[in-house]
C-alpha cells in the first residue's frame, strides 16, 4: 500500500496539478486530502479536479471548509479573523451551489499501513481543526491530545510547514501545504508506504500559476501570488508568529 497525503491546497490549482502529476508517477493506491482544499483563488476548479480523480480518495475537512459552510448557511464565521472574511465570502459565492460536496467530509480518517501501523489523518489535531502547534511546541502541552490515541502515526497540516517529530509514543508528521507553503516556493506533500514516510516537495511554473490566479477574480490575488508563490514567508518568521497562537 502506498498513500499520498496532500493538505492545504487553498484553491491553488496549478500547484495541485503539479503535485498530482508527481503522485501519478509514484503509483499510489490511495490519496488522502487533509482539508483546506478551499478557500483560495480557484475553488470550483480545484474541487472538480480532486473529485474527478481516478484513484481512491479520502477527504477530511479543515477549518477552511468549516468557515465556508458557516458562510453558505448564513452562520457567522466567528472563528475567521476579520481580515480574511472577504475571502471567505468570495469563495462562498463561487461555491454557492456546491457546499454539499464537502459538507459530509469527516474530521479524521484512519488506515493501517504495513510497516507503519495505524495512521490517523486529521487537519490540525485529532480533536480540533483550528489548534496550532509546530515542531517547536513543547511536548508536555501536546501529550494530553496525543496520549491514548492508540495510533502509531498521526498526519496533520494546518500550519503549512512540514515536520516529523515524536509526541510521547506517537510519531506526528505535518504534510505541509500544497498551495500556500511557508519556507520556500513550491508545493509540499507526503508519501507513506511500508518503507516509511517521506516529506516531498514539488516545483512548478510559478509565472504561469501567477497568471492564472490573477485572472481568477480572487480579491486577494496579488497578495496570494506574492506570499504563496513568489516569496513565501520564511519558516523562522512563521514559527515566531505561531508561537503566540500555539497550544498553551
Language-model-detected regions and their locations in the chain:
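Acidic, His/Gly-rich catalytic cores of divalent-metal-dependent hydrolytic chemistry
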Residues: 166-248
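Active-site neighborhood of divalent metal-dependent phosphoester bond hydrolases
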Residues: 53-112, 117-118, 135-150, 219
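Active-site environment of divalent metal-dependent phosphoester hydrolases
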Residues: 10-15, 39-41, 64-69, 153-166, ...
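Active-site-proximal loop/helix segment associated with metal-binding centers of metalloenzymes
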Residues: 81-89, 116, 124-137, 210-212, ...
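Beta-strand-turn-beta hairpins that frame and shape the catalytic cleft
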Residues: 1-4, 110-120, 167-171
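Anionic-ligand binding region
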Residues: 136-178
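Core catalytic region of metal-dependent phosphoesterases/phosphodiesterases
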Residues: 2-93
Amino acid at each position: 500500500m502506498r498513500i499520498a497525503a496532500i493538505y492545504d491546497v487553498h484553491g491553488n490549482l496549478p500547484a495541485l496539478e503539479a503535485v498530482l502529476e508527481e503522485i501519478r508517477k509514484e503509483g499510489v493506491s490511495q490519496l488522502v486530502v487533509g482539508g483546506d482544499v478551499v478557500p483560495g483563488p480557484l475553488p470550483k476548479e480545484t474541487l472538480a479536479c480532486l473529485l474527478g480523480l481516478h484513484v481512491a480518495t479520502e477527504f477530511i475537512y479543515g477549518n477552511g471548509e468549516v468557515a465556508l459552510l458557516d458562510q453558505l448557511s448564513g452562520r457567522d464565521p466567528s472563528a475567521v479573523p476579520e481580515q480574511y472574511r472577504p475571502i471567505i465570502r468570495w469563495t462562498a459565492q463561487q461555491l454557492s451551489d456546491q457546499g454539499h460536496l464537502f459538507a459530509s467530509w469527516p474530521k479524521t480518517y484512519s488506515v493501517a499501513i504495513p510497516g507503519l501501523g495505524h495512521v490517523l489523518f486529521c487537519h490540525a489535531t485529532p480533536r480540533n481543526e483550528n489548534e496550532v502547534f509546530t515542531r517547536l511546541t513543547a511536548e508536555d502541552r501536546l501529550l494530553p491530545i496525543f496520549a491514548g490515541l492508540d495510533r502509531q502515526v498521526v498526519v496533520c497540516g494546518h500550519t503549512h510547514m512540514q515536520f516529523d517529530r515524536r509526541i510521547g509514543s506517537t510519531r506526528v508528521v505535518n504534510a505541509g501545504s500544497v498551495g500556500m507553503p511557508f519556507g520556500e516556493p513550491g508545493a509540499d506533500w507526503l508519501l507513506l508506504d511500508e518503507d516509511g514516510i517521506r516529506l516531498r516537495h514539488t516545483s512548478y511554473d510559478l509565472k504561469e500559476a501567477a497568471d492564472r490566479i490573477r485572472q481568477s477574480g480572487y480579491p486577494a490575488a496579488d497578495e496570494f501570488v506574492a506570499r504563496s508563490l513568489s516569496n513565501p514567508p520564511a519558516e523562522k518568521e512563521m514559527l515566531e508568529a505561531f508561537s503566540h497562537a500555539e497550544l498553551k
